[in-house]
UniProtKB/Swiss-Prot annotation:
This is C2 domain-containing protein 5. Its cofactor is Ca(2+). It is found in: Cytoplasmic vesicle membrane; Cytoplasm, Cell cortex; Cell membrane; Cell projection, Ruffle. Binds 3 Ca(2+) ions per C2 domain. GO terms for biological process: insulin receptor signaling pathway; intracellular protein transmembrane transport; positive regulation of D-glucose transmembrane transport; positive regulation of protein targeting to membrane; positive regulation of vesicle fusion. One of its GO terms (cellular component) is cell cortex. SUPFAM superfamilies: C2 domain (Calcium/lipid-binding domain, CaLB). Ca(2+) 1 binds at residues 19, 26, 76, 78. Ca(2+) 3 binds at residues 78, 81, 84.
Length: 1014
């Protein structure tokens, strides 16, 4: 399918002075695509040139349109010497290749230079004409949509979820080529950016081809990563979930389910049932076949004789029993046959999605993870990267075997990551073992099930907590009790997952961010010796991180972790571990016991006294946390019943079934009694420090909550004011007398101080919740630690809370107990904010007002020289002309915008930037350099979205931030990779007030320690 690419250079503005004599510039533009280059005329002596060039036309194959970026270079003309480069713009053409997306790219793009940053802007028009032919899609994958969001995109429904797709491409890193010794830093950086852009396009095209082979049309949960392997080369890899998506033809009835967080799906099934079975007769059969096909088709070779048979039978039995009663024997037989064939087609039953509709998950087994330490070698043939493929295949096989051991046939919330230091690379993969509902997958879209009403009678909301494995043959030791909700099935005492909290999960109280942090020193060594040391340390680090998470979960009085993400980062002389998750109290699981400290025996009297004092403090902390997070209602009746918490909760929530099961449950629960206390044995200094770290964990200040999932469990009255921010901090360690204890303290202080600074800067948004808190840890130099965090602050309001219908009966009572602890005060923001309009995830109709400009400007210090502030004004004048009411492109890591409805997805934004400086001190040191660079990244992302006609970026993530510094030479370099989905949204408040109501301008930037707000 060849195509014609047409480019027009319109004008430039705010160009830098290149001629010192006249304080002006003689600018012209080179437009390059593939091997063809066009030039505009030179516009003499102007900082705001008006080229108005003719249309430059490139006749290229559609394969090149996907692989190659459009390169626009702005130069200053010199008569007697080489032309000076002002900067470049890379434009991805792929969004124009979708049938439903933008037809033209038109807007002002920041002109970016890797040494000087943003140097003015250029107005560009880009169009693509595609010609259909008989070989359509043979070499290209035009038309395949990519989404970063880890749930089915709003305004779409899933016809079929096909499954896991992965690909990687490798090449030599220009930074380590011999020519790099003689070329300028600018040329080296630009060569690197150009190569990464090419590899990214090639990777997307190859993944798209795999999707087309599976008869899909989209990739959801697309995660692309860059592995900078130094002299070994450069690897770009990606994973995702292939789907067949259908655009909702009449989005009006689906408004509640299209524009809200995961809790929105509570009402989605009933809305979608208004037009049932519109697609169940045709695509439904392959859907059940394809989706449930993810029961593992292959096993580890050492288990093939037994595991293959067992697991291939499991889905057939489940599907047959689930469908026979209603669909008849013939359909059941057909279903079995289709499932069996699908099982043979799929190798890895993985899903990169983290958010699902109700009843999609039948059971959740727990977190499965695998790590491997590898030695990097030079990539001899970039076209055949078998070595890297084999490495990841080993990891995925191990994940699959772990899921099987838990009695599960699929892995959801799956992700992969690497950590590289010199020749050593740690490969990591994790996910949540799960059993999926084939009936749901066959006859429903993944954003709302058509036959959910009939399905919900069999699987109760607590069903996903029930164990999927055999109680008599458990894969690991666990304390099992009967489910506190249904009293019929067994549940574990705690549940760890990598997914978001299911929308219908019974939760008591609010959630909170729980982090485990760990550092370990190691000896400096090379090659195999280094890899051996790291391999021996990894299991102990994972065990300690798990123990920390368990202790902190008990200290909060909670029993479930969601959104768990564990990072292991390797440096020359240390290993860092950071685990982040959102703790919740699941009412289906038993009440967690306390933490009991056991001292050494025999011991001195003063030591015993110290132990008892610490025990008292721990008990007080647990009680305080239960009050803070409103986890106290079930404990009221505990003493009167004589059995643990499940009995009174059953009496409160399920009166009709309490009489049937109370005797049996009491008998079973009494066997556990109050022995649930988690014993911490203090037998050395490390154990004592672990206990102290528990007690010194600082809770958020009054008015703040935090979580790393999209929405905080237990809060349903959001106000449509969001504030996204990114922050990067680097600390240098004193190498003298560095021990594990001091290293741990420094790392803990770094993370805690980072959170405290965010609370301080956002203090005027109280009551406020930090959602989607995403930490990334790196060891850029031998004696430094870098932590980057991206999150979004959302306000919530007490006044409307009483009017919002609560989806769970446990919440109304605790909400009235202590308003100060619930932090639901009237919003105190500037006049830019709207009135008391709120948005409830349960109700699902969000509203949007102005950005909280005044609030954040009071809470943060503004950097007047930041290009982001200028970009706000620039975007108002150009770029987003199709949406006159838009003043600034919103950015959020969430998959939705509170108070708004996403009407169109315009394509994926995947950008890689390099910034280098030889005057670090003059630019404000590390903080000023990082802050300015992050602001420039924000400005460039906004410009590309506005040029597509969009007004927001959702599912935004800063996937990489690699900082390197040479303080002696006053030099620094930073690499940032960001991605997200460009969208068009309509504000609910704008629809009600009419199109003439403008939105308030957004905030600009925060300026301390490399922080940025957007």
């Amino acid at each position: 399918m060849p195509g014609k690419l047409k480019v027009k250079i319109v004008a430039g503005r705010h160009l830098p002075v290149m001629d010192r004599a006249s304080d002006l510039t003689d600018a012209f533009v080179e437009v390059k695509f593939g091997n063809t280059t066009f030039k505009t005329d030179v516009y003499h002596k102007s900082l705001n040139p008006q080229w108005n060039s003719e249309w430059f036309k490139f006749e290229v194959d559609d394969e090149d349109l996907q692989d190659e970026p459009l390169q626009i270079t702005v130069l200053d003309h010199d008569t007697y010497s080489a032309n000076d480069a002002i900067g470049k713009v890379y434009i991805d053409i792929d969004p124009l290749l979708y049938t439903e997306a933008a037809t033209v790219i038109s807007g002002w793009f920041p002109i970016y230079d890797t040494i000087h940053g943003i140097r003015g802007e250029i107005s560009v028009l880009v169009k693509v004409d595609l010609f259909n032919d008989l070989n359509r899609f043979r070499q290209s994958s035009c038309g395949v949509k990519f989404f970063c969001t880890t749930s089915i995109p709003k305004s779409y429904r899933a016809v079929v979820i096909h499954g896991f797709v992965e690909e990687l491409v490798v090449n030599e890193d220009p930074e380590y080529q011999w020519i790099d010794r003689i070329r300028t830093p600018r040329a080296s950086n630009e060569a690197r950016q150009r190569l990464i852009s090419l590899m990214s396009g090639e990777l997307q095209r190859k993944i798209g081809l795999k999707v087309l082979e599976m008869r899909g049309n989209a990739v959801v949960g697309y995660l692309q990563c860059f592995d900078l392997e130094g002299e070994s080369g450069l690897v770009v890899r990606a994973i995702g979930t292939a789907c067949t998506l259908d655009k909702l033809s009449n989005p009006a009835p689906f408004a509640p389910s299209c524009n809200s967080p995961c809790k929105e799906i509570k009402e989605a099934p009933f809305i979608e049932e208004l037009n049932p079975n519109t697609h169940s007769s045709g695509p439904s059969t392959p859907l059940k076949n394809q989706t449930y096909s993810f029961s593992p088709s292959k096993s580890f070779s050492r288990q093939s004789s037994s595991s293959d048979t067992d697991l291939s039978l499991t889905p057939k039995t489940g599907m047959g029993s689930g469908s026979a009663g209603r669909d008849g024997g013939a359909f059941k037989a057909l279903l079995r046959q289709q499932t069996q064939s699908a099982l043979e087609q799929r190798e890895f039953p993985f899903f990169t999605l983290t958010s699902f509709p109700p009843t999609f998950l039948v059971h959740v087994g727990g977190v499965v993870s695998a790590r491997s330490v590898k030695l990097l070698d030079r990539i001899h043939n970039p076209d055949e990267p078998e070595t890297r493929d084999a490495w990841w295949a080993e990891i995925r096989q191990e994940i699959k075997s772990h899921a099987r051991a838990l009695g599960c046939h699929a892995v959801v919330g799956y992700s992969e990551s690497t950590s590289i230091c010199e020749e050593v690379c740690i490969l990591s993969a994790s996910g949540t073992a799960a059993v999926l509902n084939p009936k749901f997958l066959q006859e429903a879209s993944a954003e709302g099930c058509l036959e959910q009403r009939s399905e919900e009678t069999s699987p109760t909301p607590c069903a996903f907590c029930h164990i999927p494995y055999d109680e008599l043959n458990m894969p690991f030791p666990a304390n099992l009790t009967y489910c506190c909700a249904c009293r019929k099935q067994k549940v574990p005492d705690v549940l760890f997952t990598t997914i978001d909290l299911p929308s219908d999960a019974p939760v008591i109280g609010k959630g909170c961010l729980i982090q485990a942090r760990l550092c370990r020193l190691k000896k400096k060594s090379q090659a195999e010796a280094n890899a051996t040391v790291i391999s021996s340390l990894l299991p102990f680090m994972e065990y300690e991180l798990h123990t920390q998470l368990m202790n902190k979960l008990k200290l909060k009085g909670m029993n479930g972790l969601f959104g768990l993400r564990i990072q292991i980062t390797v440096g020359e002389s240390m290993l860092l571990g950071l685990a982040s998750a959102t703790g919740v109290y699941l009412s289906s699981l038993p009440t967690p016991g306390g933490i009991q400290i056991a001292g050494k025996t025999p011991s001195e009297g003063s030591y015993d006294q110290h132990i008892s004092h610490m025990q008292k403090k721990i008990n007080e902390t647990i009680a305080k946390n239960k009050d803070l997070y409103e986890i106290n209602p079930p404990e009221i009746l505990e003493e009167t019943v004589g059995s643990p918490i499940p009995e009174p909760r059953q009496r409160t929530r399920l009166l009709r079934s309490q009489s049937e099961s109370s005797d049996e449950a009491a008998e079973l629960d009494l066997s556990h009694g109050k022995k649930d206390a988690f014993v911490l044995e203090i037998d050395d200094t490390d154990a004592m420090e672990d206990v102290h770290s528990l007690l010194t964990d600082v809770a958020p200040p009054p008015g703040f909550y935090s979580c790393n999932t999209e929405i905080m469990p237990g809060i349903n009255n959001w106000i449509p004011n969001i504030q996204m921010f990114s922050s990067v901090r680097v600390i240098r360690l004193n190498s003298t007398n560095l021990t594990n204890q001091t290293l741990n303290k420094n790392f803990n202080d770094l993370c805690e101080n980072l959170l405290k600074s965010l609370y301080f800067k956002l203090r005027s948004m109280v009551p406020c919740c930090l959602c989607h808190v995403n930490f990334t840890v790196a060891v850029p130099e031998e004696e430094s630690i870098q932590v980057a965090v991206t999150a979004v602050a959302i306000t919530f309001d007490k006044q409307q809370a009483l009017q919002v219908p609560k989806p769970r009966p446990e919440k109304p009572q605790p909400r009235g107990s202590d308003p100060e602890e619930q932090l639901q005060f009237p919003l105190e923001l500037s006049s830019d904010s709207p009135g008391p309009s709120t948005f409830s995830p349960a109700r699902d109709v969000p509203e949007r007002g102005g950005s909280p400009a005044g609030a954040t400007q009071r809470a943060v210090s503004l950097d007047k020289s930041s290009p982001l502030a200028e970009s706000h004004l620039r975007h108002r004048g150009g770029g987003g002309g199709a949406i006159p009411s838009v003043t600034v492109v919103k950015m959020t890591p969430l998959s939705f915008i509170p108070g708004a409805k996403i009407t169109k997805f315009l394509g994926i934004i995947n950008m890689f930037f390099i910034r280098e400086t030889t005057s670090l001190r003059e630019e404000g040191g590390v903080s000023g350099f990082l802050h300015a660079f992050i602001c420039e990244v924000f400005a460039m992302v906004r410009a590309h979205v506005a040029a597509l006609g969009g007004n927001a970026v959702v599912s935004y993530i800063m996937k990489q931030c690699v900082f390197m510094e040479n303080a002696n030479k006053n030099q620094a370099q930073c690499l940032i990779n960001v991605s997200g989905d460009a969208v068009i949204f309509i504000s609910e408040s704008e629809v009600e007030a009419g199109p003439g109501q403008p939105t308030a301008p957004g905030p600009q930037s925060a300026g301390v320690g490399g922080d940025s707000a957007t």
